Amino acid sequence: MAEPLPPWVLQVVDERPPEPGAAREWVYRALERVLRDGRLAPGSRLPAARRLAQSWGLPRGAIDQACDRLRAEGVLVRRVGDGSYVADRLPLGMASGPEPVVAPVPKRAAQKVLQRMSSRLQGARPSQHWAEGRAPRALRAGVPDIDHFPLATWRRCIAHAFADEQRSSLSYGPPQGTRELRQATARYLTLTRGMRCSAEQVIIVNSTLQATELIAQVLLSPGDRVCIEDPSHPSSARLLSLAHLDVVGVPFDEQGLDVRQAREHSPRPAAIYLQPLHQYPTGIVTSEARRRELLDWADASRAWIIEVDFLNEIAHGGAVQAPLQCGPLSEQVLFVGTYTGVMFPAIRLAYLVVPPGLVDAFSSVRGMLGDHSPVAPQQALAEFIDAGHLGDHLRAMRSTYRARRDVLQRALRGRLPAAFRLGPMVGGVSACLHLPAPWSDVAVVESLGARGVEAGALSLHGWSVPGLNGLVLGYGAYESTDIEAAVDELVALLAGVRVGEPQPA
């Protein structure tokens, strides 16, 4: 006669019924609970998998897979001919007993911590760029189209990187990045930007922010003044400030950074941070005259130029300027770019091009920090570039992005008073809609969210320049119908209140 099942076998079903399609995970969590609370004690025998499957109405395979996982973790042990037993000594995290309770921080202690917090963190907000498990909604900016990415081709490149003969992809990589990706990046920059740089000048990093942080560590000292376009990427100025640098926001007009005003307040900065090819979030392209002023200022002050390039591969017609790195002050230019916009965000690969004389310094510091980007994605990306797949993808996406830009322009055209001004849209996948008084961009963004539309507040992209007020609208990741529907909500909100009436809460 079969031995009766212990009570916990039925209790776990009552406590938390199995979820369809998640049988293996449910079994694992159920066994984990009874182990933690002591209902299944060390040294006790587990009922046969067949009987558990019958009692729980689950496939036998789900029981076996969950038990295999617990055996791999040292929780269960198999005795030949006698089934599975709970280990006599459980791993520390699986020991029985009540769940640990984290004592709340007393309010007074929390206040002291906040008082000690550096002023450099004032205004910092937890990143809301991605909400786990939820796709972005139109018109959120900073999101590329991933639905049209050639995933099958990318899988083949990844598979090649993990082939048996490529076991090196499982090891640590060189701090400056794999030679294959640095060579591919140098060729890519020649084709897309007209740059002339060697593979040795390329440092592979995980993001443009990591590149900026590395520049600060290698070239700048605490207290050095850094002039930055204002507004800019919301994290850039804050990151530089966290490096104990004196960060000064510089306004700009339709020609680019206001060099005259910047020189009056900061005649000799240590570095100038800007996006001359296509400024985010405003979309402004620095004019040739303003570029000459900028180079004169940098030359006179011997300032480093941190030239950041977001998605300049996506140009919507017209002549594309060469980077400042191609000009007469190339020995003072640090060029920063990323693959996340042209590939997909999860790839987490970007690049930094440094002057030849600084290669050893940057590689050494990155090595000392223990930084390196994962090898396999680098090898896969190098193959993806060299085989022409990235070029093919870019050609297709330029057409898609241009069409979506046109949809946004048409959807807004003539539907708002002239006081609502749409910024230039010559490249990239976002636009800036400047708002007149008395509208508040933060309040508008909140109201749009209640209508199911996402947008960014221009004022939250600022550092020290007052009066920024606008909406940062993304269009790259959304179908035409989604863009049109979102604009309808935006127009209904903005056109529904006359200038001078109270703004929406």
Located regions from the model:
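Helix-loop "lid/cap" segments that line or gate small-molecule binding pockets
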Residues: 185, 351, 379-387
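Active-site PLP attachment segment
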Residues: 326-361, 373-376
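Residue-level detector of anion-binding/catalytic polar loops
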Residues: 76, 225, 246, 304, ...
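Hydrophobic residues in well-ordered beta-strands that form the structural core
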Residues: 228, 249, 307, 381, ...
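AMP-binding (ANL) adenylation modules
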Residues: 460-466
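Conserved core of the PLP fold type I
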Residues: 157-301, 313-331, 401, 498, ...
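N-terminal basic, amphipathic alpha-helical segments
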Residues: 1-159, 357, 363, 367-374, ...
